[in-house]
């Protein structure tokens, strides 16, 4: 991954996790929130850092750190971004085979709501693997939300602004019974 500058967000993790971030800092920029501020705020912190310190950046890839995204898929999203820099690139999982019920349920509900609200069909609204041009940083920073709602708001705002979506099929990875996901259907 020599062409990538990696930014890791420590979003208020406990002291017991500090060795993980110290190890990450050997190969990445680690930005820290002293208290948990939410996924959306973490993404915005990274975007603000890029805007201020990495002005030569051409594109941004966002990947969750929950073990559900393979390096190969991150690279495929990056390649799609190079060929379609005017679109929001989404690494979309194919929900077939043994998929945890809460994942299938959650994605089906949000797909329906998003399609109804935005008039655009997306196969995986909950994907944490996305890419976009650095030209969109100011726009992304203006999207409302500091927690998980930021990602859905990002999709809604992109649809409203006429930013098209480009889906890249990615492998569906679940660890255990999907304990790494924080989606709660109730």
Model-flagged regions — what are they?
Residues 23, 143-186:
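Hydrophobic helical membrane-anchoring modules
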Residues 56-68:
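Short beta-strand-to-loop acidic/aromatic patch adjacent to the donor-nucleotide binding site
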Residues 46, 66, 133, 158, ...:
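Residue-level signature of catalytic and energy-coupling elements of molecular machines
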Residues 29, 34-37, 41-49, 71-148, ...:
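Acceptor/aglycone-binding surface of glycosyltransferases and processive sugar-polymer synthases
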Residues 10-18, 67:
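A conserved acidic beta->alpha catalytic loop
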């Amino acid at each position: 991954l020599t062409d990538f500058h990696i930014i890791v967000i420590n979003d208020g993790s406990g002291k017991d996790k500090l060795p993980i971030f110290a190890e990450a800092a050997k190969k990445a920029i680690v930005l820290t929130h002293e208290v948990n501020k939410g996924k959306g705020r973490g993404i915005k912190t990274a975007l603000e850092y890029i805007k201020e310190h990495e002005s030569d950046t051409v594109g941004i890839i966002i990947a969750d750190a929950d073990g559900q995204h393979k390096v190969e898929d991150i690279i495929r999203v990056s390649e799609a971004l190079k060929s379609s820099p005017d679109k929001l690139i989404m690494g979309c999982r194919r929900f077939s085979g043994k998929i945890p019920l809460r994942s299938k349920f959650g994605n089906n509900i949000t797909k329906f709501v998003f399609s109804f609200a935005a008039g655009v069909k997306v196969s995986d609204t909950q994907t944490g693997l996305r890419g976009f041009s650095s030209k969109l940083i100011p726009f992304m920073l203006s999207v409302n939300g500091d927690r998980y709602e930021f990602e859905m708001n990002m999709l809604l705002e992109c649809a409203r602004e006429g930013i098209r979506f480009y889906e890249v099929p990615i492998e569906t990875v679940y660890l255990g019974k999907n304990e790494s996901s924080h989606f709660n259907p109730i």
